[in-house]
């Protein structure tokens, strides 16, 4: 697990680097599908002092199998998403300012331009609010369940992120670094959408044909963006 712990550590350290977290907010995980183990950031450990060896390894039930610290308080959310979506290799949760503002407003982040369409096929959805019973019960597990409820049977890598109502953004990807990359983009397009709607409150969504072109040229079966 040393390689995966190093990858998860580096991905977690990218969160303050890209301005996505304050203090100890936020966490990144990655999964070893063959072994059924997840590596995740320890709860409440400062980024300035954190080391790769501090990463916590848990099984799919959340039991710690390696590590001296307690895992992130959001571990149950990560595990629920890994169980539901086999294509996910890494997950990140932050409270980045603009994406969290959309979550607090209870609004999806609208697809307004090609920057958004290069990564997200349509609006970045916002979940419903959790009930008092869901919050007082298994809160983190139920957060995962409400994300799944919102995504349904959609391919999660086509819209690799969501905002949880009154909480904040979750993003995911093929691995931990890909998940962080998508979280950075989510924050940027959330900021762009806020600015654009401030300039033009009547601004419509991106044209569907333009969105399709930009997403498919990067992610479709005949993608041609970048190098092979």
From Swiss-Prot:
Its cofactor is Zn(2+). Its EC number is 5.1.3.4. Disulfide bonds: none annotated. Induction: Induced by L-ascorbate. Repressed by UlaR. It catalyses: L-ribulose 5-phosphate = D-xylulose 5-phosphate. GO terms for molecular function: aldehyde-lyase activity; L-ribulose-phosphate 4-epimerase activity; zinc ion binding. Binds 1 zinc ion per subunit. One of its GO terms (cellular component) is cytosol. One of its GO terms (biological process) is pentose catabolic process. InterPro entries: Aldolase_class_II_sugar_metab, Aldolase_II/adducin_N, Aldolase_II/adducin_N_sf, UlaF. Zn(2+) binds at residues 74, 93, 95, 167. Keywords: Carbohydrate metabolism, Isomerase, Metal-binding, Zinc. Substrate binds at residues 26-27, 43-44, 72-73. The active site is at 118 (proton donor/acceptor), 225 (proton donor/acceptor). PANTHER family: FUCULOSE PHOSPHATE ALDOLASE (PTHR22789), L-RIBULOSE-5-PHOSPHATE 4-EPIMERASE ULAF (PTHR22789:SF9). This is L-ribulose-5-phosphate 4-epimerase UlaF. The gene is ulaF.
